[in-house]
Amino acid sequence: MARLAPGISDAFVRDHPQVAELLAEWPAERIRQELDAVLKLWDVLDLTTAIDWHWYARLRTSAGRAVFVDMMIELNPLLLARHPDQVRPVLIHEAAHLVVQRLHGPQNPHGRVWKHYMKVAGESSKATHNLDVSGLRRKKVRRRRRRSGLSKLVKALQRRK
């Protein structure tokens, strides 16, 4: 399966043509440049090789996510294709989480230290987005609970009484 960008296959773009426009506006090199620029601004250039990113189509309503164990930023291609102007703010938001975790240890996720990094980067320190997520939520599948053989027997015995 050919990859157009980290985490994105040709087949995914065929199924979601709006993502092709996002990838044209935000190629991997541009995202890496933005990430490196903010790390330089924060004076943590030593983390440029530690922090990586990719598109992650399993995200539904989250614009992005920071994975601490892997020092990885995951970006939602479907949501950000609708709002390409939000790629940079989301990238910086998630990068700030990774930097805070690496340099300061466990902290309040959107606490004072994280807000400081966001302010230095010139981005909003708002923790959540209000982007249109219509059609992106998973459809809930209602499943009937299977009853074990024992519970069926108990029900049958109760009916006999």
Question: PLM ranges: what are they?
Answer:
Residues 1-89, 98-161:
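Active-site-proximal or metal-binding-adjacent scaffold patches in catalytic folds
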